[in-house]
Amino acid sequence: DAATQREATPEEIERMAAVIREAMDAGAVGFASSTSPAHNGEGGIPMPSRLASDEEHLALIQAMAHRGSGVYMVTKGGQMPVALLEEMAARAGRPVMIAALLHNGTNPGAVFADLDAISAANARGRKLIGQVSCCPLTMEFTLASPYPVEGLASWQPALSLKGAALEALLADPQFRDRVRAELAAPATFRLFNGEWDKVHVVQ
């Protein structure tokens, strides 16, 4: 439980690094992680990697690279700029694959700025790879398990509710106004940006 509430200690980071070194020795192709605010467990509990410090990420990437091989892949949140990933690629001497570089209607230039930063990093001799989608990101969801909006700060009170309690919150005008306001504000990374014309009720 502590892993979803705080950063790892140096001792815990070393234990994780040992597991990664063992995996690389056994033939793993690399190490993957996420800082995406959309990645939560049950009840909105953040995935442990979302709480990891930059130092933890770097230590684990360097553990991966101990044999001179491996690719680090990260689904990055807004707090992990390309410049930081370039630094990690340089210090570990290994490629970094960055996902998911998706267009954001409230901040349309952000994904292109990331792609430009990746190109510039490669021109400086780093190996950064940006993952893009060849088709629109689509999914089915329900209001009981609303993955596209789980990363919204305004939606957090709903994540631990079920049944009548959830229905009451969803009907609360103040809750709805907070969600609308957050969706209207620009964001570096967000799965859903209030593009209601793209949402279809199927059941």
Write out the residue ranges for each language-model feature:
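Active-site neighborhoods of metal-dependent hydrolases
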Residues: 1-10, 16-46, 51-62, 74-203
